[in-house]
C-alpha cells in the first residue's frame, strides 16, 4: 500500500497513503482491506483510524476498538475538535489535563478561544503544540526512518493455559526463535540494553518483567517468565505470552565501543 510506514509500537504504526493508487486512492478502503487481510492471515482483529493528520488518526484508531475503524474527513475536523477533550490528544497526560481544566480549558474549543501568548507563557513549547492540535494542525510527516527502540513478539492463545510447561514450550518453540529472527534483522550482533517478558491473564490484567542484559539470552527469558508465572499469576489463566528487547541507544553503543 505504501512504503511510508512509521512504527509506534509492537502492533501499531502510522501509514501515509496520500499518493497510493490502491483501492482507487481511498484511505478508508485501504484500512478496511488491511484489517481484513490481518484477520484472514493471522485470525487477529485490528482497529484503524483514518484522518488527514497524524494525531487525529491516532485518536480515531482508539474509537472503534477492537475490531473497527473510524474516519475523520478534512471537512469533519472542525466539528470533531469542537468537543474533543484535551486529554485525548496524544502527549496530554492526566496531570496536564487536570491542570488545563483548572484553568477552564477542557476541550479543544476552549483552547481555540484562548490566547496563544498566554499558553506560551504558561506552558512554553507545550503551549504551542496544544494550540496547534486544538486547531487541527499537525505538520509532522510519517517518518519511515524513525529509529526503532524495541523488538518484540507476542502470541494471543486460543485457550487460556494454566500449566507452566505449556508456557515454556510456547516461549522456546515459538516466541524465542521469532524474536531472534526479528532482532537479527536490525541487530545482527544481538546486542541489547534489556530483555523481558509479558503475561496477560484471563481477567485482562497483565504483568511485565525485564532485566538489564547485554545480549539476547533464552535461558534468562525463560527464568524471568517462570518467576513472573509463579509470583504474579495467582491461579489465573494466561491468554497471552510475549517477549521483548529494548535496543541500545546508538550514541551510547558508540561510546561503549570507543571505550573498548
Residue ranges: model-predicted function:
Residues 1-158:
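Nucleic-acid-contacting surfaces of polymerase cores and analogous helical-repeat interfaces
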Residues 19-21, 52-57, 200-204, 246-251:
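Short, internal active-site loops enriched in acidic
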Residues 88, 101-240, 248-253:
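DNA-contacting surface of Y-family translesion DNA polymerases
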Residues 253-260:
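Short acidic, low-complexity intrinsically disordered linear motifs used
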